[in-house]
UniProtKB/Swiss-Prot annotation:
Phosphoserine PTM sites in chain numbering: S40
Biased composition range(s): Polar residues: 198-208
Keyword Mitochondrion included in the entry's annotation: yes
Post-translational modification, as annotated: The N-terminus is blocked.
Stretch forming the transit peptide: 1-29
Positions bearing N6-(pyridoxal phosphate)lysine: K263
Comp. bias (Basic and acidic residues): 179-188
Pathway assignment: Amino-acid degradation; L-lysine degradation via saccharopine pathway; glutaryl-CoA from L-lysine: step 4/6
Protein name: Kynurenine/alpha-aminoadipate aminotransferase, mitochondrial
Keywords: Acetylation, Aminotransferase, Mitochondrion, Phosphoprotein, Pyridoxal phosphate, Transferase, Transit peptide
Organism: Rattus norvegicus (Rat)
């Protein structure tokens, strides 16, 4: 693929940082090399000397001596080598990307670690979006992505979707305003990429089926656009077998996949990873070299030690426990909604993730209801207009998260909300 046509002038202009290059060399160099190159501080002046973390199974992860010094030091902009290796093998096991054995020029799969999935997404958007570019999205969409893209000046086209995600026929109709060959003409403003959360979409909780993904991928091939597969809830799918991913069917090297460990290991450690064609991953890393320099070394080492301790089977067993927890939480909030909101509101059963998307009947705009009156009754929810490109337009929806609240709290919130809806109707 010709990736240069997708890149912004800023991204094309990025060059390797000479100082960061020495860090990459040091990460692969033999231990006896004497380096006066990097401006790394001497760990003797660091006040922290050791750390011990206790895992839920009672085992420990211990940092001391050289290992702890390394944890407190600068590291590779790609991510630490051992974590990169572990995550690459995980991607191969879970997705078996067709591009694994491609040459770099053909779109060979590569991977880099980012400071959380959001950091990776922002770098992807800044790599791809010029002012005036056309971007495909399915509304409602994740507000973090929406507000990262908006300042870059792109033109959004919303693709029809339902409780099974993007509707391929709707996407086909949107694309019919162009001819496939128009992608070779920059003045035609053909779509540069499709952005979507395929599993447990934030805020709707819906998931895209494998069959629909295949149809969408073929349309991406026909009209030559990229697919940004933002999948932070991949490990929170409530039914098995899990649906195949866009990455698993990417024969062209046109999928950029964003993964997160926030939902199953820790959100505060800020470790995510981006998988995609090598030439695009390199562009993301060049951005990291001059922004944050690298993801947090201590966070990466903590997660790496844990993953190697668990192994793939142990990690996936932990994922299954997380799924069981969130599935129970989902069932609790559905029971509370059915008890108090039946007849007052409508919702679909989330297939993954941690959100329930609710439409209030008989109210055209729930913004004031949620932002003012609900808070007066000591309940906090997110109004639906936050998840639309035109967030000034009225929306009768709101988002409820079921990740942290107890069943009793869910019941109380919906009891208060039901009374509030009745009061204003």
């Amino acid at each position: 693929m010709n990736y240069s046509r997708f890149l912004t002038a800023t991204s094309l202009a990025r060059k390797t940082s000479p100082i960061r290059a020495t860090v990459e060399i040091m990460s692969r160099a033999p231990k006896d090399i004497i380096s006066l190159a990097p401006g790394s501080p001497n760990p003797k002046v660091f006040p922290f000397k050791s750390a011990v973390f206790t895992v839920e199974n009672g085992s420990t992860i211990r940092f001391e001596g050289e290992m702890f010094q390394r944890a407190l030091q600068y590291s590779s902009s790609y991510g630490i080598p051992e974590l990169l290796s572990w995550l690459k093998q995980l991607q191969i096991k879970l997705h078996n990307p067709p591009t694994v054995n491609y040459s770099p020029n053909e779109g060979q799969m590569d991977l880099c670690i980012t400071s959380g999935c959001q950091d990776g997404l922002c770098k992807v958007f800044e790599m791809l979006i010029n002012p005036g570019d056309t971007v495909l999205v399915n509304e409602p969409l994740y507000s973090g992505a929406l507000f990262a893209m908006k300042p870059l000046g792109c033109n959004f086209i919303s693709v029809p979707s339902d409780d099974c995600g993007i509707i391929p026929e709707g996407l086909k109709k949107v694309l019919s305003q162009w001819k496939p060959e128009d992608s070779k003409d920059p003045t035609k403003r053909t779509p540069k990429f499709l952005y979507t959360i395929p599993n447990g979409n934030n805020p709707t909780g819906n998931s895209l089926t494998g069959d629909r993904k295949k149809e969408i991928y073929e349309l991406a091939r026909k009209y030559d656009f990229l697919i940004i597969e933002d999948d932070p809830y991949y490990f929170l799918q409530f039914t098995k077998p899990w649906e195949p991913t866009f990455l698993s069917m990417d024969v062209d090297g046109r999928v950029i996949r964003a993964d997160s460990l926030s939902k199953v290991i820790s959100s505060g450690l800020r470790v995510g990873f981006i998988t995609g064609p090598k030439s695009l991953i390199q562009r993301i890393v060049l951005h990291t070299q001059i922004s944050s320099l690298h993801p947090c070394t201590l966070s990466q080492l903590m997660i790496s030690e844990l993953l190697y301790q668990w192994g793939e089977e142990g990690f996936l067993a932990h994922v299954d426990r997380a799924i069981d927890f969130y599935k129970n939480q989902r069932d609790f909030i559905l029971a509370a909604a059915d008890k108090w909101l039946r007849g007052l509101a409508e919702w679909h059963v989330p297939k993954a993730g941690m959100f329930l998307w609710i439409k209030v009947n008989g109210i055209s705009d729930a913004k004031k209801l949620i932002e003012e009156k609900a808070i007066e009754r000591e309940i906090l929810l997110v109004p639906g207009n936050s998840f639309f490109v035109d967030n000034s337009a009225p929306s009768s929806f709101f988002r409820a998260s079921f990740s942290q609240v107890t069943p009793a709290q869910m019941d109380l919130v919906f009891q208060r909300l039901a009374q509030l809806i009745k009061d204003v109707s």
